[in-house]
């Protein structure tokens, strides 16, 4: 059963590392496979106050959302060999991957929901520093690495928005 909290922490660390070093690191180069994140997704979210209409379309064609879903699927498959020896860990990682896509999609279709439930992600897209707030589902690893930067967003004029993530329900 220790695999569940370890899997959740590992997945949150993975969000941080992948977002910071792959999506923003490699993704800033237009020639990179990962450029969709910076050049499509971030542009849309900034221009439309967090909304990325591409999430309203079905997962078809070759676009930012299908690339994101494919990367999550490949990541899930990479953990498959661990299933016989660490089923709770793998289950928690797979849950985290599915939850990541669910909340990330919802955040970019419903900005008011994002402000209430993922203020750190709103800060990532609409705040002054897009090179902070790397976590999407929970700000745990951002807090550990001191990359959680609270800023004003278009939805809330002041206050601490995200220092107590456990107090915010996801549903």
Task: Locate each region found by the language model.
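Hydrophobic alpha-helical transmembrane segments
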Residues: 1-5, 89-90
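N-terminal amphipathic/basic helix or basic patch
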Residues: 4-12
């Amino acid at each position: 059963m220790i695999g569940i909290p370890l899997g959740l922490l590992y997945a949150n660390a993975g969000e941080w590392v992948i977002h910071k070093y792959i999506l923003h690191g490699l993704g800033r180069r237009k020639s990179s496979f990962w450029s969709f994140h910076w050049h499509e997704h971030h542009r849309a979210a900034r221009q439309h106050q967090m909304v990325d209409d591409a999430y309203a379309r079905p997962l078809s064609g070759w676009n930012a959302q299908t690339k994101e879903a494919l990367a999550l699927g490949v990541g899930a498959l990479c953990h498959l060999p661990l299933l016989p020896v660490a089923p709770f860990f793998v289950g928690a990682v797979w849950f985290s991957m599915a939850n990541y896509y669910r909340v990330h999609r919802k955040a970019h279709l419903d900005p008011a929901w994002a402000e209430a439930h993922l203020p750190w992600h709103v800060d990532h897209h609409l705040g002054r520093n897009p090179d902070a707030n790397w976590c999407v589902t929970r700000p745990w690893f951002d807090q550990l690495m001191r990359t959680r930067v609270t800023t004003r967003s278009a939805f809330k004029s002041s206050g601490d928005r995200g220092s107590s993530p456990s107090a915010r329900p996801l549903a």
